[in-house]
């Protein structure tokens, strides 16, 4: 509910602050006094785009601020919480429009975009009578109002959940299909996998194969080296290592009794001869193992060639081929499972579509019943409001495609025939602001008691009417004010007299510049204002008495 409105340097307003309470608040004043500036200010606080022309002449910027009590307004609280802009039970909207054309907006003292301001405002205030900012002109808002009237929350939630589930499954399937044709990919990888599986790719085996290749490739050199080394260690001549060691050992044995340390040298020489013997034994074994086999060497080289070719193909080393083979096998298995998963997804998508259709059918039946009831009730109210022969039709139109839609299987269009014999036209195409306001009023009254926006603003609802019809309009607005906060700009005394609170806007010259001023009227001032609205500038006793009678009738309601 709107609690406080501040308007500064806006159009012809220098600075006004208004307090609002529950019920119906009326705003009256002479033509050109600036009555609609309050509604304009709320419009800009609701996200309407503005230019520098709204800034008061001579000022640098216009400042607008509105404070709302959202204690019991669930939708606004949820919206604020979802975007992390909540601040308890209060909500402040603020807008600055600069003379250079710039503009900034805040929600609860935090900067926001105009889009965010507009989104939140749809949960706080609804302005009727201005084409560019009337919620009921939106087909989506019409659908929401119809569902609210039908109390379809459970059915609509079921449809939304079913559509969301269907879309999630579809997205999952699309993501899998985006990876390409599974069968082609599987065939390609399986061909490569077969090539890898023909070879023994064990890293230890490949390492041993490389070692064997090196031996085979250098067998002749190895044999020659073994022969030469054996000859050096134990040849037939006196220069072999083993012969020289024996000679040295013999020389020391003849003199070792003269120096005990020579015994240690003899021990070392004995060990050296033992090691030479062991080396000769190993050399003989290696020599016997070394056989030149050209066929074996060729076979080894062919196998190594295949391994290196596979390694180049898969961009890895031969030792990494086993890991590559395992990865590819896992990928094939995964893709085979993916193919099965796609089939399962298709089945689940079909089931999700069936569930959505079932939920949407229930919602459609409820909407059809509600549309007929709301049309009848609103049509009666339209006629009461002076639009004789007017008729509201609520048309349910199927969506152009069969895809599950979160809002159900149909769209809504409110059609209005304002005069007998005229074909119904979409509500959004009504040219007359007064007719549009009265139709909106009738729809709102028909939906009394339902959970809609807390603050409703009406402008031009009394255009082109008077007398008994004006009295009916006032009664309907007051009845609406029992359920919601209503702000109504009016020039009809019958409507003004029905308000719970009454403000008067007037023009005052200050330093040769016309400015708008607004004041809250007490009972006496209110009677004077209604008398002025009845009789003009010169208030007669009859007008004063008639004003008193209108206010007395209000007390008796």
UniProtKB/Swiss-Prot annotation:
One of its GO terms (molecular function) is ATP binding. It comes from the Bacteria. The keyword DNA damage applies. Keywords: ATP-binding, DNA damage, DNA repair, Nucleotide-binding. One of its GO terms (biological process) is double-strand break repair. ATP binds at residues 29-36. GO terms for cellular component: bacterial nucleoid. InterPro entries: DNA_recomb/repair_RecN, P-loop_NTPase, Rad50/SbcC_AAA, RecF/RecN/SMC_N. Belongs to the RecN family. May be involved in recombinational repair of damaged DNA. This is DNA repair protein RecN. It comes from Xylella fastidiosa (strain Temecula1 / ATCC 700964). The gene is recN.
